[in-house]
C-alpha cells in the first residue's frame, strides 16, 4: 500500500480549507484517509501561526514508515525542519525556443555594433566646430 501525505480539500466554495492527511494513493483526494495530522488555511496571512499546523511527531513517524509527501506538503514539512526537499532543476524547459534565440542573438549583435560605433566616434579626433556668430541686429523700421 503506497502512502502519501497530502492535502484534502474542505470548506465552502471559494473558501478553501485543507486537512493534511495520510492516505492511500488510490483513494480520492477528499475521500478516505488513514490519519489527519494537520490543517492548512490558505486564507490566513502568511505570517499567521494558524495558517499551517502539522503534528511534527506523527509526520516524522509516517515519513519513517515510507509515506511520501506531495510537493506542497513537502514545502510545509521543509519549513518545519522535518523533511528536506530535493532541488528541482530542468534547465532545458526554461531555455528560449529557436525563434526566440534568433531574436536574442540579433538584438545582441545590434547592441554590439552600436557600442562599437559609439566607441569609434568617441575615439575619432573631435573637429572644432566654428564659433557661432553673434546674431545680427534686426533692422529698425
From Swiss-Prot:
Region feature Disordered, mapped onto this chain: 84-141
Key word Ribonucleoprotein present: yes
Biased composition regions of type Basic and acidic residues, renumbered to the chain: 89-111
Keywords, in A-Z order: Ribonucleoprotein, Ribosomal protein
Gene Ontology CC entries for this record: cytoplasm; small ribosomal subunit
Sequence ranges of Low complexity compositional bias: 115-141
Highest taxon in the source lineage: Bacteria
InterPro entries for the chain: Ribosomal_bS16, Ribosomal_bS16_CS, Ribosomal_bS16_dom_sf
A molecular function (GO) term: structural constituent of ribosome
Keyword Ribosomal protein: yes
GO biological process terms held by the UniProt record: translation
One Pfam assignment: Ribosomal_S16
PANTHER family per the UniProt record, alphabetical: 30S RIBOSOMAL PROTEIN S16, SMALL RIBOSOMAL SUBUNIT PROTEIN BS16M
Family according to the record: Belongs to the bacterial ribosomal protein bS16 family.
HAMAP family in alphabetical order: Ribosomal_bS16
Name of the featured protein: Small ribosomal subunit protein bS16
Organism for this UniProt entry: Parvibaculum lavamentivorans (strain DS-1 / DSM 13023 / NCIMB 13966)
Recorded name of the encoding gene: rpsP
Amino acid at each position: 500500500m503506497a502512502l502519501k501525505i497530502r492535502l484534502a480539500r474542505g470548506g465552502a466554495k471559494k473558501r478553501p480549507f485543507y486537512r493534511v492527511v495520510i492516505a492511500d494513493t488510490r483513494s480520492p483526494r477528499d475521500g478516505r484517509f488513514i490519519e489527519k495530522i494537520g490543517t492548512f488555511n490558505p486564507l490566513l496571512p502568511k505570517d499567521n501561526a494558524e495558517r499551517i499546523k502539522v503534528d511534527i511527531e506523527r509526520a516524522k513517524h509516517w515519513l519513517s514508515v515510507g509515506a511520501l509527501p506531495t510537493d506542497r506538503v513537502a514545502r510545509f514539512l521543509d519549513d518545519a525542519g522535518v523533511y528536506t526537499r530535493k532541488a528541482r532543476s530542468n534547465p532545458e524547459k526554461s531555455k528560449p525556443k529557436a525563434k526566440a534565440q534568433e531574436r536574442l542573438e540579433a538584438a545582441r549583435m545590434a547592441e554590439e555594433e552600436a557600442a562599437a560605433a559609439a566607441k569609434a566616434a568617441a575615439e575619432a579626433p573631435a573637429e572644432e566646430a566654428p564659433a557661432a556668430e553673434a546674431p545680427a541686429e534686426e533692422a529698425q523700421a
